[in-house]
A protein has these predicted regions:
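A solvent-exposed interaction/effector surface
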Residues: 1-168
Length: 168
């Protein structure tokens, strides 16, 4: 597992298919469900601009013990309609600090969030989470208003994960 240097990026406003799952391991369930839904619409992640993002989303919610809520956004073209389980909504985009991780599942990829937070505080970059030190930020990670996004993708047969921390 390797971390890149942190960089400032802007994610564009985009139309997204939105879905969330609450369970002990919600990431695989949420991503699998939406990726299958996309395939049924003739769309595949990584093709024709379709990108997938996920984030924890449990702040202020009553979640059963041992569970987490994970929310996913997948960018979609304007002509896609949702259904009872998938909402189509606007993602506002914005400014983010981005850390890319090569081969993220070969190590402790969540430690990348600490790298991003340390970079933001060391460089006096305002994060949009509302935390005042790296140590108190983790409780702010999980809301839809200022999501800390994870994006998995492949490049030349290698897997990567980009972590996005919302900043001013």
């Amino acid at each position: 597992m390797e971390f890149s240097n942190v960089e400032r990026v802007s994610l564009p406003k985009m139309l997204v298919a939105s879905y969330e799952v609450t369970s002990a391991e919600p990431e695989q369930t949420a991503t699998g469900f939406v990726e299958n839904w996309l395939k049924n619409k003739g769309l595949n992640v990584g093709e024709n601009g379709v990108r997938g993002f996920g984030f924890d989303c449990h702040k202020g919610r009553d979640i059963p013990e041992g569970c987490r809520t994970y929310h996913v956004y997948y960018s979609v073209p304007d002509n896609i309609n949702g259904d009872p389980e998938i909402q189509i909504k606007d993602f506002a985009g914005g400014n983010f600090a981005k850390l890319t991780i090569h081969d993220p599942f070969s190590g402790d990829f969540p430690s990348g969030w600490g790298v991003l937070l340390k970079w933001a505080f060391d460089n006096h970059v305002d994060n949009l989470l509302g935390c005042t030190s790296p140590d108190d930020c983790y409780s702010f990670f999980s809301n839809e208003d200022t999501p800390c996004l994870e994006e998995l993708y492949w490049n030349k047969g290698e897997q990567y994960m980009a972590l996005y921390l919302p900043i001013r």
